[in-house]
Regions:
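Phosphoinositide-binding peripheral membrane targeting modules
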Residues: 39-113
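Low-complexity, intrinsically disordered short peptide segments enriched in small/polar/basic residues
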Residues: 13, 21-22, 28, 65, ...
């Protein structure tokens, strides 16, 4: 089972091109990402622990934060949205920028925690 397909829709080339209209501030390009899930529950999915190394992309536009893993859009959140502050962004590791999402805080059919650790220098990303 592809866990990413349960977390979001496919992020194709057309979607990426559409972001250029929003004014891309930062684009990590295709980088390695460590994906972790803890107690992930929802319709058609249950995983107590999962850790996977994939390729992904982190994009910051003027108005949105987009996190892509395995070709699927995991996070697409306006920067001014009240739930944006519920994302935990950890920049303590000099080789990774980690985004933690508690899915129970978001209006969806899923619960649990996911961690997206992008293998980039956290200094590159300014939110």
């Amino acid at each position: 089972m592809n866990v990413y397909s349960k977390l979001g829709p496919r992020a194709g080339k057309d979607f990426i091109r559409s972001l250029e209209k929003d004014g891309i501030i930062f684009d990590s390009g295709n980088v390695w990402i460590t994906f972790k899930a803890e107690d992930l529950k929802g319709k058609g999915i249950y995983m107590s622990r999962l850790k996977r190394l994939s390729r992904g992309r982190l994009i910051l536009t003027k108005n949105r934060l987009i996190a892509i893993a395995g070709g699927y859009k995991i996070i697409d959140l306006p920067r001014r949205h009240k739930l944006f502050n519920k994302l935990t962004i950890d920049r303590n590791d000099p080789e990774r920028c980690t985004i933690k999402v508690d899915l129970s805080l978001f209006p969806a059919e899923l619960a649990g925690n996911i961690f997206l650790a992008y293998h980039i220098s956290p200094d590159l990303l300014t939110l």
